[in-house]
């Protein structure tokens, strides 16, 4: 072969087919450069900051809601307490007046206990009786009632023992044997305890 033919042979590819081995496809993995990593970190920082702020705001909201609910409950309790106090004020309205009138009633009872010696004293006693009855009915109309004491078992919540005596005859111990001063209720409240003598 001449030099020329050799050169042509080298330039022509051989007709033998060479099978190329297929390459396995690998999944695409982006390769980040240093600048891109910094940008991603910088982008995540505001998101994390926003999440922190959101969590903080949620805590504040929860605390404010709790405070609001507690305040509402407290207001409701105050309203109920005020209603109860107003109801008691209306129920026991006139308590101080009734207390002030009781000594007058006591004096009228003492006047009625005195003996009338002549006609003028008897007519005066009738006038005192009418005044006493009228005053007692007026007090009863406003819820003032006499405390039953004579012969009753001693009760320290409604009786005030001023003296004790020995049990005599058929008397029972801890029984009221004498009333020095009548006691009164105003509705269901003790206005004045009865002053009594108790057998022991």
Curated annotation (Swiss-Prot):
Q: Where is the composition biased (Basic and acidic residues)?
A: 1-27
InterPro entries documented for this protein: GrpE, GrpE_coiled_coil, GrpE_head
Function (record text): Participates actively in the response to hyperosmotic and heat shock by preventing the aggregation of stress-denatured proteins, in association with DnaK and GrpE. It is the nucleotide exchange factor for DnaK and may function as a thermosensor. Unfolded proteins bind initially to DnaJ; upon interaction with the DnaJ-bound protein, DnaK hydrolyzes its bound ATP, resulting in the formation of a stable complex. GrpE releases ADP from DnaK; ATP binding to DnaK triggers the release of the substrate protein, thus completing the reaction cycle.
Q: Which GO terms describe its biological process?
A: protein folding
The family classification in the record reads: Belongs to the GrpE family.
GO CC terms in record: cytoplasm
MF terms per GO, please? adenyl-nucleotide exchange factor activity; protein homodimerization activity; protein-folding chaperone binding; unfolded protein binding
Residues covered by region (Disordered):
1-50
Q: Which SUPFAM superfamilies match?
A: Coiled-coil domain of nucleotide exchange factor GrpE, Head domain of nucleotide exchange factor GrpE
- Species per Swiss-Prot/TrEMBL record: Latilactobacillus sakei subsp. sakei (strain 23K) (Lactobacillus sakei subsp. sakei)
Respond yes or no to whether keyword Chaperone is given for this record.
yes
- Localization: Cytoplasm
Q: In which domain of life is the source organism classified?
A: Bacteria
* Protein encoded by which gene: grpE
- Which key words are in the record? Chaperone, Cytoplasm, Stress response
Q: Could you tell me where the Acidic residues compositional bias lies?
A: 32-41
Question: A single Pfam family, by name?
Answer: GrpE
> What is the official name of this protein in its record?
Protein GrpE
